[in-house]
Design a protein with these regions (language model features):
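Predominantly cytoplasmic-facing regulatory/coupling regions of multi-pass membrane proteins
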Residues: 1-87, 135, 142-233, 258-306
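Helix-loop junctions and terminal segments of transmembrane helices
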Residues: 67-70, 104-108, 246
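Gly/Ser/Thr-rich beta-alpha loop segments that engage phosphate groups in nucleotides
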Residues: 103-104, 242-244, 283
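Transmembrane helix-loop junction
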Residues: 71-72, 94, 111-112, 210-211, ...
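Juxtamembrane loop-to-helix connectors within ABC transporter transmembrane domains
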Residues: 96-132
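Transmembrane alpha-helix interface/packing and boundary motifs in multi-pass membrane proteins
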Residues: 89-98, 226-241, 245
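Interfacial segments of multi-pass membrane proteins
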Residues: 109-118, 246-262
Length: 306
């Protein structure tokens, strides 16, 4: 029993956190349901298409970021394949978060195409770190705007477990970037694509909030969403479900001063666009899932793996 608990503790805690966050979200939706529906009607149809365009650009920018890292690491992959793998990873992250992560799908897909496992794995780790760096650049804006309402002790305590071994974390980071530290230009270009993705995301939020009659600074939106993103990295929920929406609604209500209905409406719309924009990945996913299943069969085999 203790072995089973140790193996599944993180998943169970995340499931419990997700369930709790979703319950709180449902209660909020029930309480503000009519107000939220009225708020949704204020969104302009043309802006729904503009946001769809921005999300399309955002997804392509994310694919370009990883493609640059792969190419500079010596992986001769065509952009079309990088794009397909990226969409497969996004779909798996959004729709299969408890079973197969998006990074696993990307890695297995790249290996299935015949590319080097070590380089692909390192490029995925570097891709994640560059994405985190991008959000980390604008997160201080969110902290500055919300400084008065943040419970600093609680905030710090929440992040301490991840920072208990900073030396080990630094070594892993340097090891991950060892290939690309000799090619700083590739890292910079990847970061530029991260900023393109972020501008599209923040622009989408800005459009929705403006439609709802609230005029908020673009940089305030950038800071508050980046802070929301960092909060969702705390492993208390699967893929940030519920937590992302509640955190953004809380920050928008208490920092910007908009109604909870506006905050939850915008958060729900952004989540919906994240889900919808990953749907192209379902076209390529079955072959990758089959490859993953075969790998699990081989790994479970009693024969030694060389």
């Amino acid at each position: 029993m203790s072995c089973w608990w140790s193996r599944n503790r993180q998943l169970i805690l995340q499931l419990a956190g997700t369930l709790l966050a979703v319950i709180l979200l449902v209660l909020l939706l029930e309480e503000k349901g009519h107000e939220i529906l009225a708020t949704l009607r204020e969104i302009k149809v043309i802006d729904l298409f503009w946001v769809a365009l921005l999300f399309s650009i955002s997804r392509i920018a994310v694919a370009c970021r990883w493609h640059i890292l792969l190419h500079s690491g010596g992986v001769n992959i065509r952009f079309k394949k990088s794009l397909a793998l990226t969409f497969m990873g996004l779909f798996a992250t959004n729709f299969l978060p408890t079973t197969i992560g998006g990074d696993v799908v990307r890695l297995v897909g790249a290996m299935q195409m015949g590319f080097d496992r070590a380089i692909c794995l390192a490029s995925i780790a570097a891709d994640r770190l560059i994405g985190l760096l991008g959000m980390g650049i604008t997160a201080p804006l969110g902290i500055a705007y919300s400084w008065d309402i943040l419970q600093i002790n609680l905030f710090a305590t929440s992040f301490l477990p991840g920072l208990q071994k900073p030396v080990a974390f630094f070594r892993r980071t340097v090891s991950t970037f060892s290939i690309w530290l000799r090619k700083p230009g590739s890292l910079l270009i990847s970061l530029v694509f991260t900023w393109i993705h972020m501008l599209c995301l923040f622009g989408s939020i800005y459009i929705f909030i403006d439609d709802l009659g609230s005029h908020v600074s673009f940089w305030m939106i950038a800071g508050l969403w980046s802070l929301t993103y960092l909060i969702t990295l705390i492993p208390i929920s699967i893929n940030g479900y519920g937590v992302q929406e509640l955190a953004f609604t809380f920050l928008m209500s208490n920092v910007v001063g908009v109604t909870p209905a506006i905050g939850i409406t915008v958060a729900a719309l952004i989540r919906a666009y994240f889900l919808l924009s990953s749907l192209p990945g379902v076209i390529f996913l079955p072959s990758i899932l089959s490859a993953i299943a075969k790998q699990k069969t081989v790994i479970s085999s009693p024969e030694p793996l060389l």
